[in-house]
A protein has these predicted regions:
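Structured mid-to-C-terminal alpha-helical surface segments
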Residues: 1-15, 25-37, 41-294
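Active-site glycine-centered loops adjacent to acidic/histidine catalytic or metal-binding residues
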Residues: 20
């Protein structure tokens, strides 16, 4: 499906891959199976242009799914986008569901994107796929780690620790910007939010791993305990806010103001953070909620 998107004249330059599939299929060694497709629309930063293009993008994606034999069961109609649910015949028998999440609010890539070739899966390999920069993928994954407590996020977070050459100042700035957009107050977040559920791991993650990954009795509980401790130690700096970082969050969450110059990244990155539609929407919501627009 990713290959078909990359070949499509409408979608190839407008949709960029992010999330667990981008991380595992393009940057890691396929340590876990990740089949859902998370995409950002990046065709235009301007909202009016996006709204003009969206029907064409949605129609192209619908056409592509249908041509590949998928039966579209749900198409999102929210302003921000949402999940496409499509049924297909599984090679293991019966039907399965492919989820494609298209986000129309994350139109501003913070660190760019690049065409990449996937890791090989048997004799298959996707090529020329537009993938979000690894730093933004990692930042999004770490925000998800503390926000939704999914076993797959904990697994991915541990694997992220093995990736060399990352610029963690970039990642921290992106974590703060993305985290500020969420429903929770990022200023209250701490390492205590990093945790794992053995039952959820067995039910939802284990089936995406090699069969013998947690074969021994007590393996799951031991792995969670070790991984949570490791991630809390290594990611603690994300929650240790400087005065400027706290002021950035205060501006967004108290006054509905974006001041990216408070963040310790290059000027061009600050400009992109300042142009994030999701952050602008969050600030608009804060001002309305606090009666600051009157």
């Amino acid at each position: 499906m990713l290959q078909e998107i990359a070949r499509d004249p409408v979608l190839s330059e407008r949709l960029v891959l992010k999330g667990g599939t981008a991380l595992n299929v393009f940057h890691l060694g396929l340590d876990r199976l990740s089949v859902d497709i998370d995409l950002n629309y990046i065709g235009a930063l301007d909202r009016a242009v996006m709204e003009t293009e969206r029907p064409t993008v949605d129609a192209a994606l619908n056409r592509l799914l249908t041509s590949q034999g998928y039966a579209v069961r749900r198409q999102p109609d929210e302003h921000a986008g949402g999940k496409w649910l499509s049924r297909y015949s599984s090679a293991l028998g019966g039907n399965a569901t492919l989820e494609i999440d298209v986000n129309y609010m994350a139109r501003q890539p913070l660190f760019g994107a690049a065409r990449m070739e996937s890791r090989p899966l048997g004799e298959m390999r996707a090529s020329d796929i537009l993938v979000l920069d690894l730093h933004e993928i990692v930042a999004g994954k770490l925000v998800a780690l503390v926000d939704r407590h999914a076993a797959r996020d904990l697994f991915d977070a541990r694997r992220i620790l093995s990736i060399g050459g990352l610029d963690w100042s970039r990642i921290k700035a992106a974590v703060l910007a993305i985290g500020a957009c969420g429903r929770r107050d990022w200023r209250t977040m701490s390492v205590d939010a990093i945790r794992g559920d053995p039952r959820e791991l067995r039910q939802k993650l284990a089936i995406c791993l090699p069969r013998d990954r947690f074969a021994g009795k007590g393996d799951v509980d031991a792995w969670i305990e070790e991984t949570v401790a490791l991630c809390r130690e290594r990611f603690a700096f994300l929650f240790d806010l400087s005065a400027n970082e706290r002021e950035f969050l205060d501006g967004v969450l108290e006054r509905g103001e974006i001041n990216p110059d408070l963040l310790d990244v290059a000027p061009e990155i600050r400009a992109r953070i300042g142009a994030m539609p999701m952050l602008a929407w969050k600030c608009q919501h804060v001002r309305k909620h606090r009666g600051l627009d009157t």
